[in-house]
From Swiss-Prot:
Provenance organism: Notamacropus eugenii
EC numbers on record: 2.3.2.27
GO biological process, any: protein polyubiquitination
Organismal lineage: Eukaryota, Metazoa, Chordata, Craniata, Vertebrata
Chain residue ranges for the region called Makorin-type Cys-His: 232-259
Zinc fingers classed as C3H1-type: ranges: 51-78, 80-107, 204-231, 360-389
Protein name, entry field: E3 ubiquitin-protein ligase makorin-1
Described function: E3 ubiquitin ligase catalyzing the covalent attachment of ubiquitin moieties onto substrate proteins. These substrates include FILIP1, p53/TP53, CDKN1A and TERT. Keeps cells alive by suppressing p53/TP53 under normal conditions, but stimulates apoptosis by repressing CDKN1A under stress conditions. Acts as a negative regulator of telomerase. Has negative and positive effects on RNA polymerase II-dependent transcription.
Zinc finger map (RING-type): 277-331
PTM (free text): Auto-ubiquitinated; which leads to proteasomal degradation.
The protein's annotated pathway: Protein modification; protein ubiquitination
Annotated PROSITE patterns: ZF_C3H1, ZF_RING_1, ZF_RING_2
GO MF: ubiquitin protein ligase activity; zinc ion binding
Length: 478
């Protein structure tokens, strides 16, 4: 034994070299070491045992294994554990059911995954195979056994507390084997949990709200693939996203705006329901014909009239224009009669109503302009839209500069002559009614655009008054 160990053995001989030397010197221990080496090294090929028989053959699972019984992997699906998990079963939609060739297992939770990792680490061969080799070697030689034991002890330092070792996480600093003294391990766990929570939050934010649950009619309930939102206190619908704060604030803001509009509408109905027309003396909202339940708002006074009565009053022919344009009660002239479904009395609200009325008129095409084929007597000051077939708007005409006072006086005299002629006779008795209307409008535009110290007027209300007079007198729909 001394001759076999002396030539190539020193005090620092490795464990593997010592094991080989002992096996060569002692013939009784050779079968033991030889029988353990195949198990430790993974066994040979063929149909023999070994760790390969614990792994299911993937080719056999698909029915295409060419080796048959000579395959070194397991062909028994009942005793071996499948490495292929059915992803459709995990989603709850596997069509094969029990006939599926893949394993039907539910996805593990975070705690179960951690326990499985610890159980897998406990099956490492380092803690079981190495002591098994040390014990038979210790019986051969005391000196060599001591060197082998010292080498194995040096190689396996800290093997007793390997269960408490820190799990290596890519991207995180490694703490080494001093797991109990490492203060960064709890922090790493907290960081990982926060990242997982952020990922789950992002997934929840990407989910869409169920449109059926928003109206309270989702038949799937908790099994719905869409997200069921929280109920809104304003509208009572499940439309608030549980995670998306921006969506929640936006919906609440829109609900508040809608609630304010509803309140304004309620107040308008409340102040309008008891208003009585000053001409027919009937409550406007209680008229038999629903189409007559509308107010005619005068621009310069706050007296109440229904639209039908005030229009009939202002279309009378037996009175002067100043009389029919004035209020029947206070005699204040108003250039506008604005149709309204609700009664408006405040000045600011009335201005908004007038502006809205003008905007509505500007969207209707002018029948006299006729998309450029005709001529409107009011030109660019017409309430209605002057547009060509291609959508272009009519450009306003430039005012004539340098017109003499004598020419303006002649045009003004001609204008008043036409007014007197209109009062003395009906211009619709002949076929030149349109010509008279256009000529009258042209002269009116000339008077307004002439400028100078002796202009007729330049306030916008006066121009609206002329427009209203022409429309009512000639029964035109300007």
């Amino acid at each position: 034994m001394a001759e076999a160990a002396a030539p190539g053995t020193t005090a620092t001989t490795s464990g593997a070299a010592a094991a080989a030397a002992v096996a060569a010197a002692s013939p009784t221990l050779t079968p033991t070491v030889a029988s353990q080496s195949p198990a430790a090294g993974g066994g040979g090929g063929g149909s023999g045992g070994g760790w390969t028989k614990q792994v299911t053959c993937r080719y056999f699972m698909h029915g295409v294994c060419k080796k048959g019984n000579n395959c070194r992997y397991s062909h028994d699906l009942s005793t071996s554990q499948s490495a292929m998990v059915c992803r459709y079963y995990q989603r709850g939609c596997c069509a094969y059911g029990d006939r599926c060739r893949y394993e039907h297992t539910k996805p593990l939770k975070r705690e179960e995954v951690t326990a499985a990792n610890l159980a897998a680490k406990s099956d490492l061969p380092a803690s079981s195979s190495l002591p098994a080799l040390v014990e038979p070697l210790a019986e051969v030689s005391t000196g060599e056994a001591e060197s082998v034991n010292s080498n194995f002890a040096a190689a396996g330092a800290g093997g007793e507390d390997w269960v408490n070792a820190i799990e290596f996480v890519p991207g995180q600093p490694y703490c080494g084997r001093a797991a109990p003294s490492c203060t960064e391990a709890p922090l790493q766990g907290m960081v990982i949990e926060e990242e997982l929570e952020k990922q789950q939050t992002n997934v929840e934010m990407k989910k869409q709200l169920c449109p059926y649950a928003a109206v309270g009619e989702c038949r799937y309930g908790e099994n719905c693939v869409y997200l069921h939102g929280d109920a809104c206190d304003m509208c009572g619908l499940q439309v608030l996203h549980p995670v998306d704060a921006a969506q929640r604030s936006q919906h609440i803001k829109s609900c508040i705006e809608a609630h304010e509009k509803d309140m304004e509408l309620s107040f308008a109905v409340q102040r309008s329901k008891d208003m009585v027309c000053g001409i027919c003396m009937e409550v406007v909202y209680e008229k038999a014909n629903p189409s007559e339940r509308r107010f005619g708002i005068l621009s310069n006074c706050n007296h109440t009239y229904c639209l039908k009565c005030i229009r009939k009053w202002r279309s009378a022919k037996q009175f002067e224009s100043k009389i029919i344009k004035s209020c029947p009660e206070c005699r204040i002239t108003s250039n506008f009669v604005i149709p309204s479904e609700y009664w408006v009395e405040e000045k600011e609200e009335k201005q908004k109503l007038i502006q809205k009325y003008k905007e509505a008129m500007s969207n209707k095409p002018c029948r006299y302009f006729d998309e450029g084929r005709g001529s409107c007597p009011f030109g660019g000051n017409c309430f209605y839209k002057h547009a060509y077939p291609d959508g272009r708007r009519e450009e306003p005409q430039r005012q004539k500069v340098g017109t003499s006072n004598r020419y303006r006086a002649q045009r003004r005299n001609r204008f008043w002559e036409l007014i007197e002629e209109r009062e003395s006779s009906n211009p619709f008795d002949n076929d030149e009614d349109e010509v008279v209307t256009f000529e009258l409008g042209e002269m009116l535009l000339m008077l307004l655009a002439a400028g100078g110290d002796d202009d007729l007027t330049d306030p916008e209300d006066e121009w609206d008054l002329f427009h209203d007079e022409l429309e009512d007198y000639y029964d035109l729909d300007l």
